[in-house]
Amino acid sequence: RGIGGASISSMFAGGAIVGATPDGRHAGTTLADGTASPAQGRDTHGPTAMLRSAAKIDQSMCASTLLNVKLHPSSLRSREDLKKLGSLIKAYAAMGGKWIQFNVVGNSQLLEAQKFPERYRDLIVRVAGYSAYFVDLNKGVQDDIVRRMEVSI
């Protein structure tokens, strides 16, 4: 028996009806894209700080404490970079983190895909708790993902 969080895709519909929040989010704008994820533009202190913050939530009884992490492709160029990512994932699990997922795509690539969808039919992104072909998403969801990727690690 556990406690569930918000729906993994409620950030769009929910955000449209939720007022402004103390973290600076404006009324009517998209909510955070995961129950343990920082709000858009708030993940400014690096991945370690983000994981430590998310791990402060007691996830032992929660079935849906999703943490979305946005990474720029340049942050995973070498074998050493991949080892560091593996260490981050292990550290998050050791702190009690249950569900972490990644978007590894550059903002410029997403904007290019919006202009020339025929060139990017194979571009897959994490939306929330699911993956989708970017060019198959509606414009509002695409724009939200573009905004999320403006601040990536």
Residue locations for each model-derived region?
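Acidic, glycine-enriched catalytic cores built around paired aspartates
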Residues: 1-153
